[in-house]
Each structure stands twice: as structure tokens, then as C-alpha cells.
């Protein structure tokens, strides 16, 4: 798994480097008066594309490891992995479209992340079965659809919450990593 983490880092580094170097021309269309433009030069806003491509390539590398017989317990290809990527597609496509056009409304992006949440619940069985409070756990047990609704709300809401926090300087990534551990 350490090797896969290193491979994922390298894929992300190479992908982000490629995007920054090769797609500068696209970044010229971003208005210079926007509050996000505090850096010098033209920097494209397609980091999500590099991260998604890194995930796909890393899972592919893990599949090759298994196929070649190395580290057979690293990651097993199954329908869950395929469903995971299918569930992510609406949110990823919306993020890339927003980065490319800067014309998507927040409502439309929220609909796409809600679609991702619904797909995650449907395809992956994501739910919130318990919260650690007896009375609330009893309610979630009696009405499992509430746990599904909470999962959809979390999947749809967290990216927007972190985007609001992140806003201008990109410092929310470390806060996100610490919170989700």
C-alpha cells in the first residue's frame, strides 16, 4: 500500500505539472479582477482533473499488480471499484466543467453532487447506520432511509463546504485531510 501511495503521489504530481505547464493558455480567460487571482502568471484551475486521473491510474496500477501476482492483497478489482468511479462522475464532470467555463451556477453543481451522493447510496450501499447517540441510533435503525439521506447530504454538502472555506488561498486541503481521518 505504501508503494501505491507513492505511485498515486507521482501520478498526481505529473498530472498537475502537466496541467500547469500545458494549459496556461486556457487560464488567460480567467478575469484578473477575481479575488482568486492573487498569484502571478496564468495558472489553470484543473487540479481536480489531475486528482481524478491520478486515482484512476493508481487503481489501474493496483490492478496490474494483482494481475502480475505482486502484492496480491494491495487492492482487489471488483464491481465496488467500478461503482465508486461511476458514482464520482457527476461531481467530477461538474467540477471540470466549472473550471473550464466558470459559468456553472452553484445550484447546478449542487445537483451534480447530489447525483453523486444518490449514486453512492444506490451503487455502493453508503449509509449512516449509527451516530453514537442511543436515541438517534434507534431512530436510524427504525428508519434506515434517514441514514441514506444523511449520507447523500454529507456527500453533496462537504465539497461545497470545503470550497467555501478554501475560497481564495487553497489552505483547506490539510484541514480536510485532518478532519476526514
Region annotations inferred by a language model:
Residues 1-181:
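"…together with the soluble PPM/PP2C metallo-phosphatase catalytic core" -> "…together
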Amino acid at each position: 500500500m505504501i508503494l501505491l501511495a507513492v505511485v498515486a503521489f507521482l501520478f498526481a504530481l505529473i498530472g498537475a505539472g502537466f496541467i500547469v505547464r500545458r494549459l496556461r493558455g486556457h487560464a488567460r480567460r480567467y478575469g484578473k479582477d477575481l479575488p482568486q487571482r492573487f498569484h502571478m502568471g496564468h495558472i489553470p484551475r484543473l487540479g481536480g482533473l489531475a486528482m481524478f486521473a491520478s486515482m484512476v491510474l493508481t487503481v489501474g496500477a493496483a490492478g496490474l499488480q494483482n494481475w502480475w501476482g505482486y502484492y496480491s492483497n494491495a487492492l482487489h478489482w471488483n464491481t465496488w471499484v467500478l461503482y465508486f468511479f461511476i458514482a464520482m462522475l457527476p461531481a467530477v464532470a461538474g467540477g471540470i466543467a466549472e473550471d473550464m467555463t466558470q459559468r456553472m451556477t452553484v445550484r447546478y453543481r449542487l445537483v451534480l453532487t447530489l447525483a453523486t451522493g444518490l449514486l453512492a447510496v444506490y451503487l455502493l450501499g453508503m449509509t449512516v447506520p449509527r451516530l453514537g447517540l442511543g436515541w438517534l441510533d434507534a431512530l436510524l435503525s427504525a428508519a434506515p432511509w434517514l441514514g441514506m439521506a444523511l449520507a447523500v447530504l454529507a456527500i453533496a454538502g462537504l465539497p461545497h463546504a470545503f470550497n467555501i472555506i478554501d475560497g481564495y488561498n487553497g489552505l483547506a486541503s490539510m484541514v480536510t485531510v485532518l478532519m476526514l481521518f
